[in-house]
Amino acid sequence: MSLPTEPPSTPTPVSSTQADREAVERLIAGRARIETELAKVIVGQKEVIEQILIALFSGGHCLITGAPGLAKTLLVKSIAQIFHLKFQRIQFTPDLMPADITGTEILQDTGEGRKMLFVRGPVFANMILADEINRTPPKTQAALLEAMQEHQVTAAGVRHVLEEPFFVLATQNPIEMEGTYPLPEAQLDRFMFNVMMNYLPEDEEVAVVQQTTARRPGKIEPIFTGEDVLRFHDLVRQVPVAENLIRYAVRLTAASRPQQTNAPAFVNDWVSWGAGTRAGQFLVLGAKARALLQGRTHVSADDIRTLAAPVLRHRILVNYRAEAEGKNVETIVLRLLEAVQEPGV
């Protein structure tokens, strides 16, 4: 997955052609239809849905953190149906091997004799749900993460290009649960967002029980196609963003790094490792997608603030002192938003 590179001045405005304008209008109108379709099977989780859509339209990948039984699989599968994308679910287990993900070569008899034939694994799809990715050892985790980065896999020295669009949503159980293999920081950094999926409020949970015990869920109707998603990738990158907002994203990211010049005192006290440059890139790119989804052709500081938590929470590593004092990543992100001055303030 190539990283976005923001130009130093004003980007090309969005909707520069009639075709672009029509695509933007379809995207804006389609968001309401997406919510309507998902409401047939999913109750609540609006913030989770918004963040997944932003990542999908930005060309990024998502890590979803939450306890089992929160309808993560149903949500991802439903989104794949809405966009008419080929969907595959990979259940990560301690004995899962890299070839179980990428595919393997087998010896097959043909009219010309025996030949090695590559049998594609489940990674050859448009939308992958990597379920409980932290249940499998690092070697197998790396097989999927390599495919995420390169959009290709290699078997017996032969490269096999993955289908586009290629979007991975990996779920993980909270790291304090038994039998987990935490993802290394360098691999976590490949995910655009870490989306927190929490238990529903009582009223929404009551609605889930009523809905799932009274009737069969409605059928999800496709709204967009894979070609539409690729077009939206281009449109998102055309959304203009002011340089002072880019600087705000960069300063917010840099402030998370301990022992740096502009690091607040609480970062030096509580953080072992801060966010890298990729965080700033994803903040700006995600802000562009959020603006476009809301019908705006410009980015605001609120877009960046709203996405700070999903972008930063898996890129900041707290130290033992923070744990002893009961401080977590969410607390640090909130403090960063208070400490870093917004543009024009």
List PLM regions with ranges.
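C-terminal engagement/docking regions of AAA+ P-loop ATPases
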Residues: S2-R21, Q259-V345
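Pre-Walker A (pre-P-loop) alpha-helix and adjacent loop at the N terminus of AAA/AAA+ ATPase modules
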Residues: A23-L70
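Conserved alpha-helical scaffold flanking the Walker A/P-loop in AAA+ ATPase domains
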Residues: Q51-I54, L107-L129
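Walker A/P-loop
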Residues: L56-P94, L107
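Walker B catalytic acidic pair
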Residues: G66, D131-E132, A143
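P-loop (Walker A) phosphate-binding loop of NTP-binding proteins
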Residues: A67, I101, T171
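Canonical AAA+ ATPase core
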Residues: Q108-G113, T136, T140, M148-Q238, ...
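AAA+ P-loop NTPase domains with strong preference for DNA replication initiators
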Residues: Q210-V299
